């Protein structure tokens, strides 16, 4: 920041030099004007002297006129160029006023449209915060300086959540959702903030946000976790188990949250047993003949238009059945080519499993924004029997286009 102001000061000095040099030169013109005034006085004195001599009879009228002409020529010679010097006098105030206004106007314009606040923020974020409150204050200043930054609003919302400021977090996530095109991850965080700030009550708005998030990304982890919590709080333990088992199936094995979620599943089973209900059977790999093996790849043409960390969803959906995927696996472009297995263990809903439908369609979709909505790169397979045992090749080779309604 010091370097910036030093450079700005040097530039200002250069600008003032251009303005003040003419003003300093004007001082020399003052001496010239004084000399001109003296010459005029001498001229007038000479004319008066000639007139006196003519009145005394020592000069003729012709000699008087010759004397006046000679005095006028001398005055003209002495005052040559004085007109230009006098014009410089008139302009002397202009550079002086400009010299004062230029830095003031420049400073005002810079403070209004400049990026001094962003430079200061960048300097702040280069240093580790001393507390969570300091980090929050920095993020608040950041979104004020860049109100159209979806990432800034998202991280501010996450920070508010760590401070149990759910209402503030909900407003931040709402703004992030508007700026990000309503990405599923942001919608899930927004729904979660509304849920916890509203006394853990499921509302129509929260349900709509959760549905929208899962429609875009069936494996959106925040939404699955939230729906499991809401179901548990409402003593819908079977639903809670279903949501949490779906969540566990998409989390990496090394994710520390897995053990906590599995603990929640176990508590839900115990509550069902205490209430005299039969818990659902633990999720297990599907029996032989219901597992579909898919070899997923991406064409060179599409590979050049996506990023290595873009999400890839591989899923199966029923032919002539509901549009909800029956089983889904999540990869990244960097994982391709890859071989995955889809089975009842990957079911999105307990009542919708591969084994419940005779034919399915395999789909692999690239999601730049981490969701599975239309408009992404896609590869589709032909309808096949769920009893198919051979590996199926699936290549992502073109943009997603709306399909005609399936029979």
Swiss-Prot record:
Q: Which UniProt key words apply to this protein? A: Cell inner membrane, Cell membrane, Cytochrome c-type biogenesis, Membrane, Repeat, TPR repeat, Transmembrane, Transmembrane helix
This chain belongs to the protein called Cytochrome c-type biogenesis protein CycH
Family matches, as InterPro entries: C-type_cytochrome_biogenesis (IPR051263), Cyt_c_biogenesis_CcmI (IPR017560), Ig_CycH (IPR056412), TPR-like_helical_dom_sf (IPR011990), TPR_CcmH_CycH (IPR056413), TPR_rpt (IPR019734)
Topology in membrane? Multi-pass membrane protein
Question: Which function does this protein serve?
Answer: Required for the biogenesis of c-type cytochromes. Possible subunit of a heme lyase.
Which SUPFAM superfamilies does its entry note? Answer: TPR-like
Transmembrane intervals: 4-24, 93-113
Q: Which PROSITE patterns match?
A: TPR (PS50005), TPR_REGION (PS50293)
What family is it from? Belongs to the CycH family.
């Amino acid at each position: 920041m010091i370097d910036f102001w030093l450079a700005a000061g040097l530039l200002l000095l250069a600008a003032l030099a251009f303005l003040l040099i003419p003003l300093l030169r004007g001082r020399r013109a003052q001496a010239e004007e004084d000399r001109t005034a003296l010459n005029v006085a001498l001229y007038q004195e000479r004319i008066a002297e000639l007139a006196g001599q003519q009145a005394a009879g020592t000069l003729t009228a012709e000699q008087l006129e010759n004397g006046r002409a000679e005095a006028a020529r001398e005055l003209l010679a002495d005052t040559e160029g004085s007109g230009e010097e006098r014009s410089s006098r008139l302009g002397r105030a202009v550079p002086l006023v400009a010299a004062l206004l230029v830095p003031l106007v420049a400073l005002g314009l810079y403070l209004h449209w400049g990026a001094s606040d962003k430079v200061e923020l960048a300097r702040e974020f280069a240093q580790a915060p001393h507390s969570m409150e300091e980090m929050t204050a920095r993020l608040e200043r950041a979104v004020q300086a860049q109100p159209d930054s979806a990432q800034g609003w998202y991280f501010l919302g996450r920070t508010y959540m760590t401070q149990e400021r759910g209402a503030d977090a909900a407003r931040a996530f709402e703004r992030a959702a508007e700026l990000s095109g309503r990405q599923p991850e942001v919608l899930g965080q927004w729904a979660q903030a509304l849920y916890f700030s509203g006394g853990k009550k499921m509302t129509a708005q929260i349900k709509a946000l959760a549905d929208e998030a899962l429609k875009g990304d069936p494996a959106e982890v925040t939404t699955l976790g939230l729906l499991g919590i809401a179901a548990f709080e409402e003593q819908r333990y079977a639903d809670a188990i279903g949501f949490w088992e779906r969540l566990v199936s998409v989390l990496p094995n090394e994710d520390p949250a897995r053990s906590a979620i599995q603990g929640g599943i176990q508590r839900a089973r115990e509550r069902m047993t205490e209430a005299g209900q039969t818990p659902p059977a633990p999720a297990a790999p599907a029996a032989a003949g219901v597992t579909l093996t898919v070899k997923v790849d991406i064409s060179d043409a599409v590979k050049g238009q996506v990023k290595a960390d873009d999400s890839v969803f591989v899923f199966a959906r029923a032919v002539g059945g509901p549009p909800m995927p029956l089983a889904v696996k999540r990869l990244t472009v960097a994982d391709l080519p890859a071989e995955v297995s889809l089975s009842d263990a990957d079911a999105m809903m307990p009542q919708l499993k591969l084994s419940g439908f005779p034919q399915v369609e395999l789909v692999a979709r690239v999601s730049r924004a981490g969701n599975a909505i239309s408009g992404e790169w896609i590869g589709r397979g032909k309808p096949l029997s769920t009893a198919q045992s051979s590996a199926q090749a699936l290549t992502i080779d073109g943009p997603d286009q709306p399909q005609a309604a399936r029979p």
